[in-house]
């Protein structure tokens, strides 16, 4: 009976350690981070921010794509910012599941997407959700900019 209890607590401790560890992802420069946090979109472009402001599931980097092209990976407290042509765009987040979000962007506007991390069966899951500018700016401010492939 005691052995079973210790095995249970040992397994639980291991799972908590894995779920709360920190993934390392390539980071953008401090200047790029500061520029993105000015939250100004170019008049002829749209800005898309994807942020992950939670530490939960931090041991697992999550792959993100924009319009079917690999953008990179997020870790805990990181974000991407992309300047894109106005129009239809699809963001995907790949973890234990694949979450997608379609945006129809307009020139001169910024869009904010929260990459929520949830408990999965074997590893964390993600859920992409568009949020309002106030919520998005606050979330991005809590994060550092990750290096993107574009």
Regions found by a protein language model. Name each.
Residues 22-150:
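Short loop/turn and low-complexity linker motifs enriched in small/turn-promoting residues
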């Amino acid at each position: 009976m005691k052995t079973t209890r210790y095995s249970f607590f040992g397994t639980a401790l291991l799972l908590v350690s894995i779920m709360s560890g920190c993934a390392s992802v390539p980071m953008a420069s401090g200047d790029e981070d500061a520029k993105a946090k000015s939250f100004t979109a170019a008049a002829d472009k749209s800005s898309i921010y994807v942020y992950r402001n939670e530490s939960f599931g931090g041991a697992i980097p999550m792959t993100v794509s924009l319009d079917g092209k690999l953008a990179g990976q997020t870790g805990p407290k990181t974000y991407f910012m992309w300047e894109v042509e106005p129009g239809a765009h699809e963001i995907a987040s790949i973890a234990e599941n694949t979450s997608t979000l379609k945006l129809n962007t307009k020139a001169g506007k910024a869009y904010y997407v929260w990459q929520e991390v949830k408990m999965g069966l074997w590893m964390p899951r993600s859920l992409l959700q568009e949020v309002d500018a106030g919520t998005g700016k606050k979330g991005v401010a809590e994060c550092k900019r990750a290096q993107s492939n574009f």
